[in-house]
C-alpha cells in the first residue's frame, strides 16, 4: 500500500450557490428571502410541480411496461427524438435527413460534459484550440472545460457601466480569436445577466463566427421558460442552422419542466450529413459508457410523455406561460418599487433582462449588506433568481437594495 497521505490535500471550497442555500435554510428570520438557487417557485415561495408533469408522472407509473431497467447508452429513444424535435421545430428537415446525433444526458451539466469531452478528444487534441466562454457565465462552464485540460478564455458580455450587453466587446473577441476556436454561446436567457443579443446582433455574431471558422456550442437551459414561447427562445440556434455548419447543443429540461432533481437533458450534434452524424454518435456512446454508463430513466419517461402527447404538450406550453409571466411580473414589481423609493441609479435593466436571473449591478459589499441586514441570500456578483421573489417579499427586497445602494454607494 502506498504511504501517500490524503491528510495533506487542500480542502476544496464549498460551491457558492449551494452554500448560500444552506445558509438560507439555517436562518430563522421570518423575512428571509432565497434568491440564490435557479429553481422556480410559485407566489407562495413553494416549489411548483407543473400540472403537465403531474399528469405525465401518473401515466408513466400506471403503464404496464413501467420498470426500473437500464436505458440504452444513448438514452430513451422516445425522449431523445422528441427532445430534438422540440428544439428544432423550425427545421424539421434536420431530423428527416438524419443529421442530428442526440445523446440523453444528466441534465444540462451532463450535456455540457458530453460536448466538451468529445470536442477535447476529437478537436482540441488535433488543433490546440481554446474555448471562449462569456464573462460572466455559469461557473461550471469554466471548471468543466478546465478539468478536461482545455484552455479557457473569455469574451466580454456584460457592460457593467451601462448594465447592458457588451455587443462590440463580444464581436471584437470573436474576430480576434485564433481561427478555429471554440465559442460557447447561451441560446437564450443568458446566465447570469439575463441579457440576450437582439436578432440583428445575433446575425452579425454568426457571420463573424463563420468568417473565423470557429466551432460553436449552444447551451439552452431555458427554452420556453424565458419568454413563454418555445420557438422564440430557440430562435438563435435555429437561425444558425441556415448556415449549414456543424455545431453542438446542450439542452436541459430542469427549468422548463421543473425536473431539477431528475437530471433530464440531451446533447445534440448537428452534422452536415448522416454519415458524420453516425460516426459522432458512436464516439459519444463511448464517452457516455465510460462515465455514467447510461442515463437516468424516470425524468426522461416523464418528459417523453409530455413531448409526445398533443394534450400534455399543449398543457405544458400553458405551464411555461404561467412561469414566465410570473417572472416578468416580478421584474416589473421590483423595478417599480425601486423607482418609487427613488433608489439612486437606473433600474430599467431589470425589466430589460429575460429569464430566471437578473444581474442587479449590486457590488459584493452591497450584497453582503443585504444578507446581514435584510436576510437576503443571493450571489456575491449581484445575480438574483427572480423566481425567489413574490408579492409578499418584493417590497422587502426593494427596500434592502435601496438601503444598500445609499449606505454603500
From Swiss-Prot:
CDD domains membership: AAT_like
Gene Ontology cellular-component terms listed: cytosol; nucleus
Pfam families referenced in this protein's UniProt entry, alphabetically: Aminotran_1_2 (PF00155)
Residues engaged in binding L-aspartate: 38, 138, 191, 383
Cofactor(s) needed: pyridoxal 5'-phosphate
Modified residues (N6-(pyridoxal phosphate)lysine): 255
Oligomer and partners: Homodimer.
Chain's role: Plays a key role in amino acid metabolism.
Protein name: Aspartate aminotransferase, cytoplasmic
